[in-house]
Amino acid sequence: MRLLTHNLLSSHVRGVGPRGFPLRLQATEVRINPVEFNPDFIVRMIPKVEWAALLEAADHLHLIQVPKEPIQGYEHNEEFLRKMHHVLLEVEVLEGTLQCPESGRVFPISRGIPNMLLSDEETET
């Protein structure tokens, strides 16, 4: 699971609502998986990133190169775009868990895939 994916996921346990974000990330296995640099894609994704959630996830993974916020004029700053490309697309959590901050529900991550399936009792009606 890439950190970009983590940044888009939230818990849909019944009664949680918007407080199910961000999911707390605990990784037991992380891999750096090189991906071709696409600056246009990163430029389009930066405004969609929930920065506080990204910083929290990066902190859990001990990624020190994550800027505290997008820099002014990032669209034209290749160094910044490459850092964000690395953090969002190349850091991959293979094994671990995601935990809902409101309900405490734990979702496993296995072979890079987060299992967000809920039982019938947990789903919203």
Curated annotation (Swiss-Prot):
GO terms for cellular component: cytoplasm; nucleoplasm; nucleus; perinuclear region of cytoplasm; tRNA (m2G10) methyltransferase complex. The modification Phosphoserine is found at residue 119. InterPro entries: Trm112, Trm112-like. GO terms for biological process: maturation of LSU-rRNA; maturation of SSU-rRNA; peptidyl-glutamine methylation; positive regulation of rRNA processing; rRNA (guanine-N7)-methylation; rRNA methylation; transcription initiation-coupled chromatin remodeling. One of its GO terms (molecular function) is protein heterodimerization activity. It is found in: Nucleus, Nucleoplasm; Cytoplasm, Perinuclear region. Residues 2-119 form the TRM112 domain. Keywords: Cytoplasm, Nucleus, Phosphoprotein. Gene3D superfamilies: 2.20.25.10. Pfam families: Trm112p. Part of the heterodimeric BUD23-TRM112 methyltransferase complex; this heterodimerization is necessary for the metabolic stability and activity of the catalytic subunit BUD23. Part of the heterodimeric N6AMT1-TRM112 methyltransferase complex; this heterodimerization is necessary for S-adenosyl-L-methionine-binding to N6AMT1/HEMK2. Part of the heterodimeric ALKBH8-TRM112 methyltransferase complex. Part of the heterodimeric METTL5-TRM112 methyltransferase complex; this heterodimerization is necessary for the stability of the catalytic subunit METTL5. Acts as an activator of both rRNA/tRNA and protein methyltransferases. Together with methyltransferase BUD23, methylates the N(7) position of a guanine in 18S rRNA. The heterodimer with HEMK2/N6AMT1 catalyzes N5-methylation of ETF1 on 'Gln-185', using S-adenosyl L-methionine as methyl donor. The heterodimer with ALKBH8 catalyzes the methylation of 5-carboxymethyl uridine to 5-methylcarboxymethyl uridine at the wobble position of the anticodon loop in target tRNA species. Belongs to the TRM112 family. This is Multifunctional methyltransferase subunit TRM112-like protein. It comes from Bos taurus.
